[in-house]
Curated annotation (Swiss-Prot):
Belongs to the thiamine-phosphate synthase family. This is Thiamine-phosphate synthase. Binds 1 Mg(2+) ion per subunit. It comes from Haloarcula marismortui (strain ATCC 43049 / DSM 3752 / JCM 8966 / VKM B-1809) (Halobacterium marismortui). One of its GO terms (cellular component) is cytoplasm.
Length: 211
C-alpha cells in the first residue's frame, strides 16, 4: 500500500549544500511516503549512483521509490516504478517493460489528460502545477497554475490516486487535499528547508487536516 500523503521529488540544485540522501533520510523519518529521483541536470551515472543510495534508504523505511522519466534507470536500481511526463514513453509501454507490479505515475494538468492516463493504466497521477512554482523554469507564472478547482474536477473524473504538485507548502496543502487530492508532492518545501524532517512533518499534518 502506497502512502501518498507527502511525496518528495529530489532536486539537488535547491539543497543549499546538503546532500540529497541526507535530505531524503531526514524526510522519510517524518512522514514522506514516496520519493521520486528527479535530478534532470545530473548525468546518467550520477543519477544511478544517487539512485542506489536512495533505493537503500527507501527500502529500509518501506517507502515507495520511483524514478523520473528513465525506465532503464528504474530497472537498473530496482526502483518500485517510474514517473512519466508528456515527452516520455507512453504508460502502456512502460507497463510492458516494467511489469504489472510496477508503480507507474503520469504528470497531467487537465481533466482530459487525467482520464487518458487512467485509462492507459497509470497507477497514480501528479496534477499541476496547482500553484505557481519556481522549481520548474517553464511554469514560474500564475497563468500556468491550474488551481484547486482543477484538482476538484480531476478528483471527480478519475478513480486512481493523485497528488497535487507545484507551489505546495504547509500553508496550502490542506486546501489541495480538501479539493480531492490524495496527497501533495513537493520539491522546494522540503529540499530548501533548514529542517527537512520538520518540513515533512508540517506537510503531513496539513494533509491530515484536509481530510
Amino acid at each position: 500500500m502506497v502512502d501518498w500523503d507527502v511525496y518528495l521529488v529530489t532536486q539537488a540544485s535547491l539543497s543549499a549544500g546538503r546532500t540529497t540522501d541526507e535530505i531524503v533520510a531526514e524526510a522519510i523519518e517524518s512522514g514522506v511516503g514516496v520519493v521520486q529521483l528527479r535530478e534532470k541536470n545530473r548525468t546518467a551515472r550520477e543519477r544511478y549512483e544517487l539512485g542506489q543510495k536512495l533505493r537503500e534508504l527507501t527500502r529500509e523505511a518501506d517507502v515507495t521509490f520511483v524514478v523520473n522519466d528513465r525506465i532503464d534507470l528504474a530497472q537498473a536500481i530496482d526502483a518500485d516504478g517510474v514517473h512519466l511526463g508528456d515527452d516520455d514513453l507512453p504508460v502502456s509501454v512502460a507497463r510492458d517493460i516494467l511489469g504489472d507490479d510496477a508503480v507507474i505515475g503520469r504528470s497531467v494538468s487537465t481533466v482530459e489528460d487525467a482520464r487518458e492516463a487512467a485509462t492507459a493504466g497509470a497507477d497514480y497521477l501528479g496534477v499541476g502545477a496547482v500553484f505557481a512554482t519556481g522549481s520548474k523554469d517553464d511554469i514560474d507564472d500564475e497563468e500556468y497554475a491550474v488551481g484547486t478547482d482543477r484538482v476538484a474536477a480531476i478528483a471527480e473524473a478519475v478513480d486512481i490516486p493523485f497528488v497535487g504538485i507545484g507551489g505546495i507548502t504547509a500553508g496550502n496543502a490542506t486546501a489541495v487535499v480538501d479539493a480531492g487530492a490524495d496527497g501533495v508532492a513537493v520539491i522546494t518545501e522540503i529540499t530548501k528547508a533548514d529542517d527537512p524532517a520538520a518540513a515533512a512533518e508540517a506537510l503531513h499534518s496539513a494533509v491530515e487536516q484536509g481530510r
